[in-house]
Amino acid sequence: MMVACVDAQRDTYGVESICAHLPIAPSTYWRHKAQEADPTRRAARVQRDAVLRPTIARVWHEQEQVYGAEKVWRQLKRDGVVVARCTVERLMKDLGLRGVVRGGPAVVTTSPDATAAVPDLVDRQFSATRPNQLWVSDFTYVATAEGFVYTAFVIDVFARRIVGWKVAATMHTDFVLDALEQALLRRGTDDLPDLVHHSDRGVQYVSMRYSTRLAAAGIAPSVGRRGDSYDNALAESVIGLYKTEVIGRRDRWQGLEDVEFATLRWVDWFNHRRLFGPIGYVPPAEYEARYYQQATAA
């Protein structure tokens, strides 16, 4: 800022005269100008920062502009860039880059008391030792110019991978059933031994049609307690990421097709490029691939 001010006035008043009225010494000004003319004369940190800034900005933009300093740093490490986390945080602040902040209410559609007979087989233990051991499901709403639309997800707990999803104009049973069918198609019903499907007690998930489809695929149903979001915490966590990283970043959504396209793009990024701390800061697809490679080698 000071250097730019001197630059603007020095032909008229001279450097020494201007610096006499500003908190900058003439020697400091001339040193800065020499470094501008010859970048090799800059301090090592300044030179390093100049190289890192575009790299950090590239990673942030490639990762859907949602990563904070921690995830940007982790991605840089995966890319072979050696840099301290505090440096990434400092340069992101200089560049005006920041991660998105989660927040927002959830949709709740509780079912009649008759569904209390369906057990909670998970008991808040959202962990799995292999793919297709535990799936969790949930859905949320999105306000658009054409009215509310709804997005449902089926997530494989092992790698946090989204294996099924659906965007619809209504939240009837068909809507969540379509997400389940997509998951079954992708995973294949022949490779689902002892699979548990967990959800909240929403009317869609405990309906006769949904329960029948689970039974036909040999999947054991599990539901959390009424009104307790912690009983489906992992699914709600993914919903929270979706609302933060996709929906909340736009002021206005036009309609179903608009949301559907954005969701398609996000799910692909989520599964194949987004880093997850609980699985070692790798994408879900990579984590699953490692499992199958190790299983084959054994």
What are the language-model segments listed below?
Residues M1-A298:
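Charged DNA-binding/catalytic regions of mobile-element recombinases
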